[in-house]
Amino acid sequence: MELPFASVGTTNFRRFTPESLAEIEKQIAAHRAAKKARTKHRGQEDKGEKPRPQLDLKACNQLPKFYGELPAELVGEPLEDLDPFYSTHRTFMVLNKSRTISRFSATWALWLFSPFNLIRRTAIKVSVHSWFSIFITITILVNCVCMTRTDLPEKVEYVFTVIYTFEALIKILARGFCLNEFTYLRDPWNWLDFSVITLAYVGAAIDLRGISGLRTFRVLRALKTVSVIPGLKVIVGALIHSVRKLADVTILTVFCLSVFALVGLQLFKGNLKNKCIRNGTDPHKADNLSSEMAEYIFIKPGTTDPLLCGNGSDAGHCPGGYVCLKTPDNPDFNYTSFDSFAWAFLSLFRLMTQDSWERLYQQTLRASGKMYMVFFVLVIFLGSFYLVNLILAVVTMAYEEQSQATIAEIEAKEKKFQEALEVLQKEQEVLAALGIDTTSLQSHSGSPLASKNANERRPRVKSRVSEGSTDDNRSPQSDPYNQRRMSFLGLSSGRRRASHGSVFHFRAPSQDISFPDGITDDGVFHGDQESRRGSILLGRGAGQTGPLPRSPLPQSPNPGRRHGEEGQLGVPTGELTAGAPEGPALDTTGQKSFLSAGYLNEPFRAQRAMSVVSIMTSVIEELEESKLKCPPCLISFAQKYLIWECCPKWRKFKMALFELVTDPFAELTITLCIVVNTVFMAMEHYPMTDAFDAMLQAGNIVFTVFFTMEMAFKIIAFDPYYYFQKKWNIFDCVIVTVSLLELSASKKGSLSVLRTFRLLRVFKLAKSWPTLNTLIKIIGNSVGALGNLTFILAIIVFIFALVGKQLLSEDYGCRKDGVSVWNGEKLRWHMCDFFHSFLVVFRILCGEWIENMWVCMEVSQKSICLILFLTVMVLGNLVVLNLFIALLLNSFSADNLTAPEDDGEVNNLQLALARIQVLGHRASRAIASYISSHCRFRWPKVETQLGMKPPLTSSEAKNHIATDAVSAAVGNLTKPALSSPKENHGDFITDPNVWVSVPIAEGESDLDELEEDMEQASQSSWQEEDPKGQQEQLPQVQKCENHQAARSPASMMSSEDLAPYLGESWKRKDSPQVPAEGVDDTSSSEGSTVDCPDPEEILRKIPELADDLDEPDDCFTEGCTRRCPCCNVNTSKSPWATGWQVRKTCYRIVEHSWFESFIIFMILLSSGALAFEDNYLEEKPRVKSVLEYTDRVFTFIFVFEMLLKWVAYGFKKYFTNAWCWLDFLIVNISLTSLIAKILEYSDVASIKALRTLRALRPLRALSRFEGMRVVVDALVGAIPSIMNVLLVCLIFWLIFSIMGVNLFAGKFSKCVDTRNNPFSNVNSTMVNNKSECHNQNSTGHFFWVNVKVNFDNVAMGYLALLQVATFKGWMDIMYAAVDSGEINSQPNWENNLYMYLYFVVFIIFGGFFTLNLFVGVIIDNFNQQKKKLGGQDIFMTEEQKKYYNAMKKLGSKKPQKPIPRPLNKYQGFVFDIVTRQAFDIIIMVLICLNMITMMVETDEQGEEKTKVLGRINQFFVAVFTGECVMKMFALRQYYFTNGWNVFDFIVVILSIGSLLFSAILKSLENYFSPTLFRVIRLARIGRILRLIRAAKGIRTLLFALMMSLPALFNIGLLLFLVMFIYSIFGMASFANVVDEAGIDDMFNFKTFGNSMLCLFQITTSAGWDGLLSPILNTGPPYCDPNLPNSNGSRGNCGSPAVGIIFFTTYIIISFLIVVNMYIAVILENFNVATEESTEPLSEDDFDMFYETWEKFDPEATQFIAFSALSDFADTLSGPLRIPKPNQNILIQMDLPLVPGDKIHCLDILFAFTKNVLGESGELDSLKTNMEEKFMATNLSKASYEPIATTLRWKQEDLSATVIQKAYRSYMLHRSLTLSNTLHVPRAEEDGVSLPGEGYVTFMANSGLPDKSETASATSFPPSYDSVTRGLSDRANINPSSSMQNEDEVAAKEGNSPGPQ
């Protein structure tokens, strides 16, 4: 690639002139001629890579800096295109002031204006001007605002239309209209503009009052914003890309939904019309009853819906006095039904998107029966979870592909830049060699830098105080205070800011200068790493920080620096002042060149060097400037007035404050204050006592004062200039200011909302809580990356809200006050104004669309509503929101949750905690030493050797005290690193500036047991008093450490470094001095601090190996045997020997598989028994007595099992196993409850509670079922991360909860009238507040009640937020909030309308982000665990994986023998028909037609239609039966070898059966429903799956499902277990609650079956609010606590605490964790499946290979003749195909030939695979493995040893041709000689002696058709040499020279030449 500085400076930019155009025409002509010649020569197009436009020169991009400065006179002028790609296109480019590239067609615009026309040039200038686009953007935004108003005059529209027309005219004049490249209509965004303008004029011309549809197109103007802002175009590109990708998923989804809808249609049609009608109503009258006729129809209590019922035994039943009859209406305005395919499809789509599906579920089960729950389970798990998450998977992948493309683009730019830099380096080297000083070049007049004022640059140097010397020759680093202050602020020397998105890595020739790894979040480089790696950054002051840069000039290195670079912390020594003599001269005013010679000889060289260096410098300067947020004048002002350096006393005062605020304890105190302050805010509740309120107020004042002081101290200590450079400090400052404002305001004033700002202080915890920090960063990154996407989403919401308002506002019956009234009812969700319209669209995005759509369909046209709502649902919810989640997940992969943050202050906190721990250690050691001094004899002598191992406390082990390298403060670099432990290490806890790194080997446990810790502590304290012993041990410890160091070079600490933990004794004892130079050699370990193995410890671990032996473990732990010597018995002596034998016997019993099976069976039985203990148990005394008896039996068996295991395993092993503990606890619960029952204490409340814990019994099954255990293990692994996220969610939610308490506490109460059903609010005109409600309650019907879920305190606030976040029950909470007024006043309709926004904001941040973090965390965790347990593929390169996968697929295949054609001619004729592809296609078409006829069926269709459909059904059955018979006739016994045929056969049998049965059962139809047989017919649809073989994408999706099934089954099992346990709990706790909301006679906790129905429903979180509502009742008017129940208990109230815990835990476990595991598995497998499908060779390619092979090898011999190879290669499809002419390629493949000139299929397949994948070293070994595999499964190849290869054959062929030619010419010559001498007989004699029908003659006739089928093995000499690869290299004849024209010849001939 030609680099851009071939011609530097302004010469890059040339005006576009007529000569330029003529040149382009010449180029085009030359290009065409070359193309023609190529086509003629090759006969086909070149397959080489076509030239592509350069990425950084695309239109709309900014021109890179290294093209030089653009002269002012060329701005907006046509220029010759810089991109070589366009040299053959009639185009030119134009640059505006901001260097944005625009391209235009060089043809005549509108056939009137040439590129050189003045009018066109003016139009171009205007169109590229930045102000033009700004003006248009502002116009569009104003227009959008105007469209939301309804009261604006029509004339305003015309103004906008005129502006848009002007814009379009300018663009058309500048670009031309549509014919050529870069014209107006060639840009799809302009189509939008054009249509908007056209519609505006059409609307003005015709009166559009009636056709409001067209007016709504004005809304599309909002999309014009996208066409103006370039960044948005990219995201829209990604969106369109993902929509394209969704094609396969859409087809699969529609297909699955159609199948489910058909099943639903057959099962449930007409059922939802069944209602409870009053007894005595005439059935004919019932047919005409509409749902409005309430006097006849029973209404479900608490609702306005009629009660549905069914006639089945398990369907819903009617109450007394009512009978179940069919009515004409379906529920929900007649829209919820399965009566026709369309309605069934809508219902299924609703089920898939899970919008209020619990309502459909309850209605269907009530009308049809509980058994149909199976249908819903299938649809929810397959349809909803699988298909919806496939959409997520596809969108995620599309996004990843898009971002990969972006990364590739960046890398391409980087590569280009790299090359540019190399050129620069070469230039510099050349100049340096010539002795030219490029430093002086900087002042050259031509340089872009010359234009910069030197004064302008000076302040920048000041601003980078940390980077070098200032004007007054005083290095700022020399001042230790400044140094520490800057280091604290992250501005330390040795650091340099870098932008996050920096794409360039700079490399100097002699040294790597790519960015170091240590970039912190805020883009700060860690100085230590920079200096340690010796890296420098190209740029201002680059060399000042680390080691000196090495110039390409010869120079002596600075000898004193090497050590600093490598061994020590990267802290500059402050030696480098402005007058530093050594090293190259570094210009302190910020120049970037490293060359230091001082003369310029030749002007040309000077100019050349100047131009290159200056351009590069300007590029680097551009990077540098992009990081400067303020103009230089402001910086100088800030430095002058915001750095407060006064008298020495002031500095002393500052120093003292600095010490105070940077002390780790100060950090700890502030953190604690934040926590306490948060607790104070969370304690607010309603109602509060005055004293409590006063306490909270006082607390608030105290905290505000405290935080104000903290801020003031920090500002003084750091100076405002540095203080405000940290984001956290700005954040603090804002919060403190707001707190002060709030304090100054009155409590109830308008500023009380400011209190909520104080809550943001919680986020300060992120500084000391890495997980919170990471998650905030993830959300931050996502919001950042999502900036554009959020904007797109906003535009989508805006457009749809406007469309809705424009189309539907009139239909909603809007009043002047903006309230919508329909049928006398006020509507909350309507489209009368923009705000309500926005809310409706937002609600659809939340996934709730169906209820609004019903209302819309009632008030307006059904079609408009369906289209509008479904479009928003599919586009907004499924695509855009999934793209959001994709971005979130993407952020996860970038940020690992477990990674600790490299933030100095985080470590301050850890240091403070470490100090406290040290104090704790010392105290514990003092106590331990006191004890040990009295009990010294107890310690065994051998253990003293452990004493010197310094123990790590838990927090240290966790964090390894890796404090941030606050590098500037260690001044004494010259001291030996480990010379004095007393000096260096004694201070490591207190000195925050020491870098301590204690890495731990991966395999080690991070935490020591506390016992051991204490043990070691007491041992070391004992040794304090025994210096002699210590002295003896020291050499050994020393040895150990040396051993360690030798083993693992490069750490920074040895065990010595932890000296402070060993107390004064370590410090008192001088350790051997370590010389400074040896630092790196002696004390380092690369990632390991494994101590020397102690023999004692090794011996201790040996008993753990006993698991593998057939003998039991020790019974007790060492601790027990040490303290109780009696436990330590000799098992070889009597009587203990007998005991040992008993133990061995027990061990064998317990380990026996039968024992385990028996226990599993017992667990299942006992769990099953629990299911019978329902609410009706008292009514079944016999069942009750059986259950009591079995309970005792099970308890006895489990106790016996436990005792057996104790004896067999011993206490030690039993109680160190978590699963055994679980068993132990559950057995104890059973035992306790059994004993209580025997002692007749079973009615005691605590025993009752304990009995409910028996529900945990099924948990014991967990450890026994492998599948579930795997899932549980994975979950347990994820628990830390899940808990982290849960905590962070709680913190996020805490803020919203406290805000909710501030806004709504006490305001949700209202006065209700209990006479209505459901209870209705009393009108506020009658009752205005609480006291009025009580006063008017003379009738006893008015009650002042609180909404059950409210914001009266933070805990209830959490519950309310959980309901909002899961979108269940959130409507009631929102309505209460929106209607709320003052405390204790009656709510008014939409009194507080904008409170909706509180919920909108919470849903976006609290609901959307935090709940999706769960998916992210779980997926992330699974990936981590996979890596830990990773298989071989982790250690394989991508190339190897491709080969591995290709070969894996190869091995499982072999050539199939095709079904032989029958000899009978009739059978043969049928065989030919049924094996044709056309026959299959016809059958498929018939299957589709059959499916369509099934769709036509409806409920209550006419007699005639039923008959016709019956006939059509019979016709299809006959056709399919005919197909089946024909195939069986033709294929004979082979028919059943194909799975699809067997499937067809079963379907046909079932279809015939259903026809016969339905005929027989016509008379019995009333007693027996033929639904079952209807469904059987649907099995035929399954045959469509055969079609799917053709659709690769869909097959990938199904393949992903098949791969997921095993994992999904395990997850399903776990989910079932959780449901089972919870349903048992539910039966025990909530059996008697009142029927209300979600609980009724069918859905309740009275029986096990009903509990499971409820729990399945809330697995997706659907309707859990309804189930919780009655449980929250505590008394009248909702329930009666004294009502007697059937089982002897009293009351039908719930227990709110138990209910809330029950439902929230279930939702977290099932909905957030288990269901997200399901999602994680699907995403994972989808990725795998897609990878497989995108591999160069897939399963199908090999299938296709073998299918084609069958045609060429009908006998399945696995060989084909070489002559057939060319045709075979051409017949293949896909990547393996080698199209004709292919002879040349095939010969070059060097395939082995066996006798008979045949080639084995595996050899061909290998060669073709190699042809696709290219060369690879792994191929040979894989090939060997493959051949072994193939031999094992297939016919032996051994008898066919290869005797030649195709290449050898070709060589011999050529040799033969040469010999033949020579022979012929010899013969000709001879015959002429003979004819002359007339010796003809002699010639014949000679002829006879020549070789006759041999190889040569065969070669001469090789062009003739084959005669013989069998070729003899003598055709080739059977030498094995010919087989060996690589022989071709030794061959004398080079075949390629003679092959050139052979391809053409071969192509002309029908057959390829081959040996016979």
Curated annotation (Swiss-Prot):
It is a multi-pass membrane protein. It holds the Pfam family Na_trans_assoc. InterPro entries: Ion_trans_dom (IPR005821), Na_channel_asu (IPR001696), Na_chnl_inactivation_gate (IPR044564), Na_trans_assoc_dom (IPR010526), VGCC_Ca_Na (IPR043203), Volt_channel_dom_sf (IPR027359). GO terms for biological process: AV node cell action potential; behavioral response to pain; bundle of His cell action potential; cardiac conduction; circadian rhythm; detection of mechanical stimulus involved in sensory perception; detection of temperature stimulus involved in sensory perception of pain; establishment of localization in cell. Residues 31-54, 441-484, 537-581, 1008-1094, 1906-1956 are annotated as: Disordered. Expressed in dorsal root ganglia, trigeminal ganglia, nodose ganglia and sciatic nerve. The chain crosses the membrane at residues 126-149, 155-174, 188-206, 213-232, 249-272, 373-398, 659-683, 695-718, 727-746, 753-772, 789-809, 864-889, 1149-1172, 1186-1211, 1218-1239, 1244-1265, 1285-1312, 1393-1419, 1473-1496, 1508-1531, 1538-1561, 1574-1595, 1611-1633, 1699-1723. Glycans are attached at N279, N288, N311, N334, N1323, N1329, N1337, N1687. CDD domains: Na_channel_gate. Belongs to the sodium channel (TC 1.A.1.10) family. Nav1.8/SCN10A subfamily. The sequence contains 4 internal repeats, each with 5 hydrophobic segments (S1, S2, S3, S5, S6) and one positively charged segment (S4). Segments S4 are probably the voltage-sensors and are characterized by a series of positively charged amino acids at every third position. This is Sodium channel protein type 10 subunit alpha. The gene is Scn10a.
